[in-house]
Amino acid sequence: MDISLESLWNQILERLQLQLSRPTFETWIKTATAEAFTEDRLTIRTPNPFARNWIQKYYLKTIADVAHDILGHPVDVQLVIAEGEETPSSEETDLGFAFPPLFRNPSPAPAPQRERMSDLNPKYVFSRYVVGPNNRMAHAACLAVAESPGREFNPLFLCGGVGLGKTHLMQAIGHYRLEICPDSKIFYVSTEQFTNDLIAAIRKDSMQSFREHYRAVDVMLVDDIQFIEGKEYTQEEFFHTFNTLHEAGKQVVLASDRPPSQIPRLQERLCSRFSMGLIADIQPPDLETRMAILQKKAEYENIRLPREVIEYIASSYTSNIRELEGALIRAVAYISISGLPMTVENIAPVLTPTTAKLEASPQTILLAVSDTFGIPIEDLKGNSRRREISVARQVGMYLMRQHTGLSLPKIGEEFGGKDHTTVLYSCEKVADLQRTDPEIAQTLRQLSDRINLASRQTEN
């Protein structure tokens, strides 16, 4: 096959972009360049030895397979290192990534308590947490850890659905420790931030500084640890960070929407370590607990609520505390603007659209995605791997999972008989993009609003 180096490399990049997650592609593949190409050999230049070793270990076969598909015959892929790359000085102070404020520009004297708490939400304290049958064990475990970190439950693994108070409890531990021991080094970080800092450290060749910062803590609070799934190097680095802290008797608290054993593509050794302490499950609150949550929220906001209003809102929102509190805010805002008295009859209209859980039809979703992306429905159901079609198809699968009760195999059938693993991969990829790409996130919000509106109109 007669093809130029530039054309071959562009085609390889295009296909790899579809196969790999965005952070993986931009960190490892996009930074590489095609150096030379003969009939049976492709030479790729990497920016540094670390990148070469990483691509060699995890992505070389994928690149070779893609090149084989394009050329129609096997090709030997060689990796070389760019010449003249300067190694940053060990005294370099600009690491190229933002650590949480606790670690940025440390001074010899201890920082004031308020600076150490700058990454913690001041509202997330134990005194503002409503305890019920659904979260009693998790609350007790967090309080025990806050009083005696690194002893009974280490690590402490909190698991539960979205909006059930995991982050509140984690940060309450941090506030409690700082209150009784102001010099404690408390580190609250999301898994996404850990990954982003790691990527930036690799690019700047600042891994030693990265490790020193992440391992010089007394209590490490890591949120949304489920997002570590499938990120091999992040898992590798977190494994060693975890071991360092645990062996030093430092407390580690993790939060996830599922237990360790149910996190896909999680290294077995990490799963084992996450499970070696206490796993505390948080369930959706019952009616009495939901009413207590609303009452406490109203008290802190100095809002007077009739009992029947509290009971109405608590009965309408059963699974998510964020939605529960959001409904209260909407109701109060509406009454404040309208000047009407706070009654069930007056707030019901503003809560009903959100309360009603409408299920969209697959056709409604296909039409919305087709119109938004300008892609015919038959192409969404087809097998084209053109980037614009693939992205639209993946978004459609994600929205169908969000807005219908269809199983993964059934969603695959709606898209021309795709395998359920393809649907799962698409949903995970779009979920990743939603967190990292503001444009995709906005498109998803607009599509969801459009789908919900169409579903309500159909119901009416």
UniProtKB/Swiss-Prot annotation:
Superkingdom, natural source: Bacteria
Region annotation Domain II: where it falls in the sequence: 75-118
Domain III, AAA+ region: annotated segments: 119-335
Cellular compartments annotated: Cytoplasm
Domain remark in the UniProt entry: Domain I is involved in oligomerization and binding regulators, domain II is flexibile and of varying length in different bacteria, domain III forms the AAA+ region, while domain IV binds dsDNA.
Region of interest (Domain I, interacts with DnaA modulators), ranges: 1-75
Region annotation (Domain IV, binds dsDNA) ranges: 336-460
Function, in words: Plays an essential role in the initiation and regulation of chromosomal replication. ATP-DnaA binds to the origin of replication (oriC) to initiate formation of the DNA replication initiation complex once per cell cycle. Binds the DnaA box (a 9 base pair repeat at the origin) and separates the double-stranded (ds)DNA. Forms a right-handed helical filament on oriC DNA; dsDNA binds to the exterior of the filament while single-stranded (ss)DNA is stabiized in the filament's interior.
Residues that bind ATP: 163, 165-167
Keyword tRNA processing applies: no
Pfam families registered for this protein in UniProt: Bac_DnaA, Bac_DnaA_C, DnaA_N
Family membership noted in the UniProt record: Belongs to the DnaA family.
SUPFAM superfamilies named in the record: P-loop containing nucleoside triphosphate hydrolases, TrpR-like
Assembly information from the UniProt record: Oligomerizes as a right-handed, spiral filament on DNA at oriC.
GO biological process, one term: DNA replication initiation
The protein's name in its UniProt record: Chromosomal replication initiator protein DnaA
GO cellular component entries: cytoplasm; plasma membrane
GO molecular function terms noted in the UniProt entry: ATP binding; ATP hydrolysis activity; DNA replication origin binding; lipid binding
Keywords, comma-separated and alphabetical: ATP-binding, Cytoplasm, DNA replication, DNA-binding, Lipid-binding, Nucleotide-binding
